[in-house]
UniProtKB/Swiss-Prot annotation:
Region of interest called Disordered, as start-end residue ranges on this chain: 1-38, 73-98
Similarity remark: Belongs to the UPF0390 family.
Function: May have a potential role in hypercalcemia of malignancy.
InterPro entries hit by this protein: UPF0390
Name of protein: Leydig cell tumor 10 kDa protein homolog
Start-end of Low complexity biased regions: 16-25, 73-83
Length: 98
């Protein structure tokens, strides 16, 4: 039998933060929304890019129309919140050249 007190309590080795984050991401379960699998053929890549650009343009046009209609009907000026410049810079740097 051991004599005296232990100098320190035995502890498990600390896990890295990246490993802990990956483990928690795995344990979260399925996520909402569709999945996009990138195609291999260049023609299909261009078609998807065109489709995405059209969807973005249509959405922006609809948002602009709604804002204009709302601003004309309201007695007070409509103030809109713009996205921060950090997000715009990050999104522009991640775009792939066509």
């Amino acid at each position: 039998m051991a004599q005296g007190q232990r100098k320190f309590q035995a502890q498990k080795p600390a896990k890295s933060k990246a490993a802990a984050a990956a483990a928690s991401a795995r344990n979260r379960g399925p996520r909402k929304g569709g999945r996009v699998i990138a195609p291999k053929k260049a023609r299909i890549v261009q078609q998807q890019q065109l489709k995405k650009n059209l969807e973005v343009g249509i959405r922006k046009k609809i948002e602009h129309d709604v804002v204009m209609k709302a601003s004309t009907s309201l007695p007070k000026k409509l103030a809109l919140l713009k996205a921060s410049t950090k997000k715009k810079e990050a999104s522009s740097s991640t775009k792939m050249p066509a």
